[in-house]
Amino acid sequence: MTNHSVILCILDGWGNSENSQFNAIAQSYKPCWDNTILQYPKSQLITHGLNVGLPDGQIGNSEVGHVNLGSGRIVLQDLCKINNEIKYIKNNRYLLEFIKKIKQNNGICHIAGLLSDGGVHSLHTHMLDIIDTLSNFQIQIAVHIFLDGRDTPPISAIKYINILREHIKHLNNVNIATISGRYYSMDRDNKLDRTRTAYKAMAFADAKRYTDPSLAIQDSYNAGITDEFILPCVIGDYNGMNPQDGFIMTNFRSDRAIQIIKMIIGDIKTDNHITLENTIGMVKYSESINIPCLFPNNNITNTLGEVIANHKLHQLRIAETEKYAHVTFFFNGGREDTFENEDRIIIPSPSVTTYNLMPEMSAKEVTNTVIERIKLQKYSLIILNYANADMVGHTGNIEATKQAITALDQCLNKILNCIQGTNYVLVITADHGNAEEMFDVKNNMPYTAHTLNPVPFIICNYSKQIRLKNGRLCDVAPTILEILNIEKPKEMTGISLIEYI
């Protein structure tokens, strides 16, 4: 091993695009960045489709990006795995056991999930396939719909409602029970008041009632509320859950499923509570959630974090709340426990309704803490995530996103200044694009989703003369190991992108 240490700085949602129109990054004031891309070796990384273990053409996301970054290999993602296996769902032993308990208890089945073709947290066809299988067992099914508007256009929910209604129109035992914007039903930031609002509608039918989901959605549109933020409401004569019922979550991404599931199974209590013990998920969401899953996860070994730990080196993971799981759980390939000599720091995200109201988020606090830890000269590897470009980009507010980019630029400048004269090498990249495309010209509305654009890959303050090849996210870990002069394990099929001059 050499005396080099590495800081991997992940600029979440920072993509490259030659088109400056509606590009918050290109239009922002960022003198440090502009100088950095001229001064240091740079290339680009692919973040979508087959190159990250997703279906061809599927937009990448933060979970997928961090799994690939940390694993050093293309990891087959849950979306692909479920697409391959759901055709056999009627024979799935976990689902059959779930159904058996419902029938024994004379309960109904509650099925909930994000009704979206975004492919980030869910895929609507998975829900439809499971509904078909459940309906064949002659049990009553209540569907709880989470509305997207973030990985899909902000005003598109009625399209997906109509797809569902067309699919179930001949199924007399299936009814839409509630709808809720994902802002409430899929919070991950411990803003439990949001989760409780969704839970009360689902568990007790305690929300405004509509005869038709499309009417509820249109009412929200008329009030200027887009899909993501639609208040939970009850549909038709739905009257709530009972303890003998079953609950199935069709989201396959864990971070935004955890809070609502913990409320359903009673791990997070409310003033009034109904606990559904017969609960099942698509995947293993967390070691702290003890429920079965339809599609068990594969174990990923010899990730970057594990290799660092095996060499008895110290490492640090740091991010604000919104991205903390990404630099820990996801970066470690789905492992919740820390490795030996792995420190973790979570900086609270600001308590605001949406992050366009505070574009700087907690980047300054993250930066100050990182600088304190750099000065300790303790860590061989520091992994940090800046959430701003992604989280503010998701609001669709280009002016706020430009402010977020400027705030990030100031943070990068502080870190670069801090490592001058040290053995730290700063590796800058992103997990996917977002902030470089802020408007959907085709639909004439703000663009709030991720992009298919490549992301930057820059190496700063390295003592050797190099150039960088273009690559994929899975090539980042092998590149870092080369800088650290650590042999790449055989499980890592990515390659180092360094070419020595």
Swiss-Prot record:
EC code(s) of this entry: 5.4.2.12
Pfam families per record: iPGM_N, Metalloenzyme
* Reactions this protein catalyses: (2R)-2-phosphoglycerate = (2R)-3-phosphoglycerate
Give the protein's biological function: Catalyzes the interconversion of 2-phosphoglycerate and 3-phosphoglycerate.
Its lineage opens with: Bacteria, Pseudomonadati, Pseudomonadota, Alphaproteobacteria, Rickettsiales
Give the source species: Ehrlichia chaffeensis (strain ATCC CRL-10679 / Arkansas)
NCBIfam families according to UniProt: pgm_bpd_ind
Any idea which residues are catalytic in this one? S62
Q: Which cofactor does it need?
A: Mn(2+)
Report the sequence similarity comment from the record. Belongs to the BPG-independent phosphoglycerate mutase family.
Q: Which GO terms describe its molecular function?
A: manganese ion binding; phosphoglycerate mutase activity
The record lists Mn(2+) 2 as bound by D12, S62, D431, H432
Q: Where does this protein hold substrate? A: H121, R150, D151, R182, R188, R253, S254, D255, R256, K323
Query: Which pathway does the UniProt entry assign to this protein?
Result: Carbohydrate degradation; glycolysis; pyruvate from D-glyceraldehyde 3-phosphate: step 3/5
Key word ATP-binding present = no
Q: Which keywords does UniProt give here?
A: Glycolysis, Isomerase, Manganese, Metal-binding
PANTHER family the UniProt entry points to: 2,3-BISPHOSPHOGLYCERATE-INDEPENDENT PHOSPHOGLYCERATE MUTASE
- Presence of keyword Repeat: no
The protein's matches in Gene3D superfamilies, at most eight in alphabetical order, are given as: Alkaline Phosphatase, subunit A, BPG-independent phosphoglycerate mutase, domain B
Free-text comment on the cofactor: Binds 2 manganese ions per subunit.
The protein here is known as 2,3-bisphosphoglycerate-independent phosphoglycerate mutase
The biological processes this protein is annotated with in GO are: glucose catabolic process; glycolytic process
User: Where does this protein hold Mn(2+) 1?
Assistant: D390, H394, H450
An annotated GO cellular component: cytosol
Record gene name: gpmI
State how it assembles: Monomer.
